[in-house]
């Protein structure tokens, strides 16, 4: 599958967040062309401020693969990751992050900060932006 097809999967995941009145953001984690984790925002559903789509997709991928280092993974997110999610993506050693829309209020991949490619951190993610934005 290509970036457009995988972002469509993330968008479908985002729509599921509307079922429980959450912000419609979706994320899909892929390794070797196979989806290993997908999620949507569940902050309202779980009453959990950390239940962002990217974090939940990383957790699902780590469980599926049986490891926390996701150095061969690409994560597709419908919106630019926030500081918490960007930090989680770096901590998981994600190889590449692809996102759709920028987030001028909380974007931590380009708009406000560049956590994903900060050379002071222990890992830098490759980045592709604006897919299906």
What are the language-model segments listed below?
Residues 10, 14-17, 27, 37, ...:
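Small-residue (primarily alanine) positions within well-ordered alpha-helices
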Residues 67-79:
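Immediate flanking context of iron-sulfur cluster ligation sites
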Residues 1-17, 32, 81-84, 88-133:
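Zinc-dependent deaminase
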Residues 31-32, 59, 71:
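A cytosolic small-molecule/anion-sensing beta-strand core signal
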Residues 21-25, 71:
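Short, basic and Ser/Thr-rich N-terminal targeting/leader segments
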Residues 45-56:
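A short, polar/charged loop-to-alpha-helix boundary motif
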Residues 25-33:
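Short beta-strand scaffold segments in enzyme catalytic cores
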Residues 36-43:
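Short beta->alpha transition motifs characteristic of CBS
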């Amino acid at each position: 599958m290509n970036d457009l097809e995988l972002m469509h999967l993330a968008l479908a995941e985002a729509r599921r967040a509307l079922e429980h009145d959450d912000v419609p953001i979706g994320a899909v984690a892929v390794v070797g062309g196979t989806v290993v984790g997908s999620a949507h925002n569940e902050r309202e559903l779980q009453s959990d401020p950390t239940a962002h789509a990217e974090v939940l997709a990383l957790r699902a991928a780590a469980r599926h693969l049986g490891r926390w280092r996701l150095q061969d993974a690409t994560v597709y997110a419908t919106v630019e990751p926030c500081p918490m999610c960007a930090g989680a993506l770096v901590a998981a050693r994600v190889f590449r992050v692809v996102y759709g829309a920028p987030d001028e209020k909380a974007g931590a991949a380009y708009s406000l900060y560049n956590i994903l490619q900060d050379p002071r951190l222990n890992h830098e993610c490759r980045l592709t932006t604006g897919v299906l934005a």
